[in-house]
Amino acid sequence: MDFLNSSDQNLTSEELLNRMPSKILVSLTLSGLALMTTTINSLVIAAIIVTRKLHHPANYLICSLAVTDFLVAVLVMPFSIVYIVRESWIMGQVVCDIWLSVDITCCTCSILHLSAIALDRYRAITDAVEYARKRTPKHAGIMITIVWIISVFISMPPLFWRHQGTSRDDECIIKHDHIVSTIYSTFGAFYIPLALILILYYKIYRAAKTLYHKRQASRIAKEEVNGQVLLESGEKSTKSVSTSYVLEKSLSDPSTDFDKIHSTVRSLRSEFKHEKSWRRQKISGTRERKAATTLGLILGAFVICWLPFFVKELVVNVCDKCKISEEMSNFLAWLGYLNSLINPLIYTIFNEDFKKAFQKLVRCR
């Protein structure tokens, strides 16, 4: 996104020399982040394209997100690095307009993709049967197209207002002199998608938790109706033990109290039932914790990366007396860019199919 920079023309040669190590460090660090973002998103895109098992409408949204984040890495980050290191814009206003357009559009599109993915997952859980019919490649394509169209509509007005004021040739920024422009762009690009994502993921977690409990209760109810409360292996084992035990007793001692024998068998079954119930509770608890962890990572990364930047954009541009340093402004912008590196990691790291696809790509199989 846009941020302020100052010219270094007034600095002496000695001052520039003293600042050189820090500039080199910043340049290498940011270049490393850009390279990592490019590589990881490329892997996600390649994995989805070449792996037939990943050809699913839900993964098309992931692929489109990866394409968007890839564009941020190759079209936005490099220009930003040059701008930060040089401390002035040297590529002319035409390139500046193109860079700002791509910057705002791609960053907005990346955020809106997260909303689309949240909506897709919400419908897949809460309306599984009906949505399974609608969840087609065409449907995914329509969602992706809508996301890009909305992103363009959100990003274009700030660029139009940019040309209403005068800009120096050595700077490439959007001056938010219009409060309406600031509110429109920040709420459209972040605050509204954030509210939507928070609501959807809260409902997803509640729905998933309820679904686990219903399935668990349904399995137990079915087994109790059938008179079975054991795992298949445990059931066979118990039948074998109880049958041989009864047969042995009946042959060796005709006066055996069979009520006691059946009591022993019931006791064994009760123990297996308790063990099975405990195992299921453990599995259910593990699933819920995993779901909570995944959702927590998704929301946490998104909020940590983008919230500071958009708070700054809203406060600084609405409040005339509020100022922020150039270094902090740059840091907040790159904290937002960092989300393009984190996105492919979070959305694929918990998926075994993606892990296997990555391994095949790395091994060139």
Curated annotation (Swiss-Prot):
Coiled coil: none annotated. PROSITE patterns: G_PROTEIN_RECEP_F1_1 (PS00237), G_PROTEIN_RECEP_F1_2 (PS50262). Residues 50-59, 120-139, 203-291, 351-365 are cytoplasmic. Residues 1-24, 82-96, 160-178, 316-327 are extracellular. GO terms for molecular function: G protein-coupled serotonin receptor activity; Gi/o-coupled serotonin receptor activity; neurotransmitter receptor activity; serotonin receptor activity. It comes from the Eukaryota. One of its GO terms (cellular component) is plasma membrane. Keywords: Cell membrane, Disulfide bond, G-protein coupled receptor, Glycoprotein, Membrane, Receptor, Transducer, Transmembrane, Transmembrane helix. InterPro entries: 5HT1F_rcpt, 5HT_rcpt, GPCR_Rhodpsn, GPCR_Rhodpsn_7TM. CDD domains: 7tmA_5-HT1F (cd15334). One of its GO terms (biological process) is G protein-coupled receptor signaling pathway, coupled to cyclic nucleotide second messenger. It is a multi-pass membrane protein. A motif (NPxxY motif) lies at residues 343-347. SMART domains: 7TM_GPCR_Srsx (SM01381). Disulfide bonds join C96-C172. Belongs to the G-protein coupled receptor 1 family. G-protein coupled receptor for 5-hydroxytryptamine (serotonin). Also functions as a receptor for various alkaloids and psychoactive substances. Ligand binding causes a conformation change that triggers signaling via guanine nucleotide-binding proteins (G proteins) and modulates the activity of downstream effectors, such as adenylate cyclase. HTR1F is coupled to G(i)/G(o) G alpha proteins and mediates inhibitory neurotransmission by inhibiting adenylate cyclase activity. PANTHER family: 5-HYDROXYTRYPTAMINE RECEPTOR 1D, ADRENERGIC RECEPTOR-RELATED G-PROTEIN COUPLED RECEPTOR. This is 5-hydroxytryptamine receptor 1F. It comes from Pan troglodytes. The gene is HTR1F.
